[in-house]
Amino acid sequence: MLAKVAQRKGRGDVRIDKISDGNAACGFAWTWVSGNEEGLRGTTFIELNENGEIQYVREIPEPIFKPGDLTVELLKAVTADAVPKPKPEYQKQTPTTANEVAKYLFLNVQGSDVAESMRFFDDRIFYRDFNYEEPLIGKAEVKNFIETFSFPGIEFRPERFDDGIDSSCFTWDVCLDGQPETIKGLSFYELDPETRKIKYVRDVPESAIKPPILGKLARDFRPGLGVFKGVPIGSRPGGM
């Protein structure tokens, strides 16, 4: 960790874009900035012990190479022989805190009813999944995204949730049928303060290329930005 700090010392800053309001654990979305440019983005999850000391951290930067729809094709190829499982049963609920919404969607509803999941998204949802270059805007695009990634042999397995009220961060593994290794990731969910529906999502998966050579090269080449080419501050969709 000290080596990572030393590499960027005096060469750039970390902008905190969003931070969840959990007490026992929280997460934050961040962007590296240097001068008038911004670069690498990512998310960090931090969990405290009973003494208020940090006991667990997961931090994942965005992949430099974003495969887009090739991600789906690869996952479907890996799970081609998977046998469909019965849809899980769930008891319908309407949670209104961010961490409970996330838990309900991924511990209860997942794999059962896309329509029930969509009930919790705001009409103007801004959804950033770092497998893709561009964000998803609106419920129609998000619904198509969820349906695209719903096929036999893939399981989105949440691990740790924070206790945020208006926003929540949680860790997860993507488990593929018959594969011993998983794909780790982080998600950040933010609710609209009035409707209590999800208005913002950031999903960050591990790089599909392991070890992530492109990421290391970019950070060595431009340690202040962490990417090969930065963009003007605030020029990205949604400002981040």
Where are these regions (language model features)?
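C-terminal and inter-domain tail/linker signature
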Residues: 1-240
